[in-house]
Amino acid sequence: MLSYYFQGLVLGAAMILPLGPQNAFVMNQGIRRQYHLMIAMLCAVSDLLLICAGIFGGSALLMQSPWLLALVTWGGVAFLLWYGFGALKTAMGSNLELATAEVMKQGRWKIIATMLAVTWLNPHVYLDTFVVLGSLGGQLDVEPRRWFALGTVSASFLWFFGLALLAAWLAPRLRTAKAQRVINTLVGLVMWFIAFQLAKEGIHHIQGLLN
């Protein structure tokens, strides 16, 4: 059964490593050393819930509801455009160090709310967990499926805690105005690129519904 565990671990790592809103938020909280381990835990637990829902039956609901899939896709496009705009606006600010200090004043609950938004409003999370992992895991018997799910969940926990701790360790270098400008510019452009790719998928979904 360990082979199924490592299959899930490798696939989960491959899907979670690319830069997205969730990774960007965890990284930024690590750089600020503000509730970064709590955020890593909440992201990992959210992934656990989504992965289990997708692998153990949730994928069928999404795949059988094309309008729901289209709604999730276009909602994600709007969210990613907004998130990317915020990152680029910060990158073009006149005083990034002042902006970073201002963000440090955010309360715990506001940070948690933002984390929930970047996780649960991100359509890629549902496409990855429900469509990709769900379709692969759904083909397995019950016991192998459990090991496969455990592997993908392990990848999430290892990645989010590793990212948060690494960002906190590198904080003195990454907290400078120059580094923050580069990071926010990269995050903003990547978010807009993902939004563009999702918009193309959304148009395809709508065309399929109308035909």
UniProtKB/Swiss-Prot annotation:
Alphabetical list of Pfam families matching this protein: LysE
Compartments reported by the entry:
Cell inner membrane
From the UniProt annotation, give the residues forming the signal peptide: none
Swiss-Prot/TrEMBL keywords: Amino-acid transport, Cell inner membrane, Cell membrane, Membrane, Transmembrane, Transmembrane helix, Transport
- GO MF term set: L-arginine transmembrane transporter activity
Task: Write out the transmembrane intervals.
Answer: 1-21, 37-57, 68-88, 111-131, 147-167, 186-206
Query: Per the record, what are the reactions this protein catalyses?
Result: L-arginine(in) = L-arginine(out)
Give each disulfide bond as a residue pair: none
**What membrane topology does the annotation report for this chain?**
Multi-pass membrane protein
What the record says about family reads:
Belongs to the LysE/ArgO transporter (TC 2.A.75) family.
Protein function: Involved in the export of arginine. Important to control the intracellular level of arginine and the correct balance between arginine and lysine.
What PANTHER family does the record point to?
Answer: ARGININE EXPORTER PROTEIN ARGO, ARGININE EXPORTER PROTEIN ARGO-RELATED
Please identify the protein, giving its name as recorded. Arginine exporter protein ArgO
Organism for this UniProt entry: Enterobacter sp. (strain 638)
